């Protein structure tokens, strides 16, 4: 397994990882696995506009709704982004909802923490 983040003690090895791969190594054990191609078709449509970024992201954008499936190529995960939603929480779950709240055992709703929100809006790419 590659060393995550700091390379102290590994000065003679080229094992530092960063960005999406770093986040995936830290957090992906709590992420749901999902089919990237099905999500692209569902949210970005059959003919999405595809762009890539300098940071290793491939973006599939619906030309009408502007909703994007953002694939982190190195991290092997994706998120679903809706630019029409204002504020910080503009990523969607697999049902197309902003998962701001969770339902407790007693049936009441409670707001999610940032960590919980990130956990339910990151999806490991099903291979």
Residue ranges and their predicted role:
Residues 59-69:
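Charged, amphipathic alpha-helical segments
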Residues 1-59, 73, 77-127:
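Low-complexity, glycine/serine/proline-rich disordered segments
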């Amino acid at each position: 397994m590659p060393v995550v983040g700091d390379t102290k003690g590994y000065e003679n090895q080229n094992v530092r990882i960063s960005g999406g791969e770093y986040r995936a190594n830290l957090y992906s054990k709590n992420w749901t696995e999902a089919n990237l191609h099905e999500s692209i078709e569902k949210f970005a449509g059959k003919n999405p506009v595809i762009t890539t970024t300098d940071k290793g992201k491939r973006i599939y954008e619906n030309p009408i709704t502007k909703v994007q499936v953002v694939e982190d190529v190195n991290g092997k995960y994706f998120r679903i982004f809706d630019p029409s939603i204002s504020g910080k929480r503009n990523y969607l779950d697999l049902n197309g909802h902003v998962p701001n709240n969770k339902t407790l055992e007693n049936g009441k709703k409670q707001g999610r923490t940032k960590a919980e929100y990130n956990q339910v809006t990151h999806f490991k790419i099903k291979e």
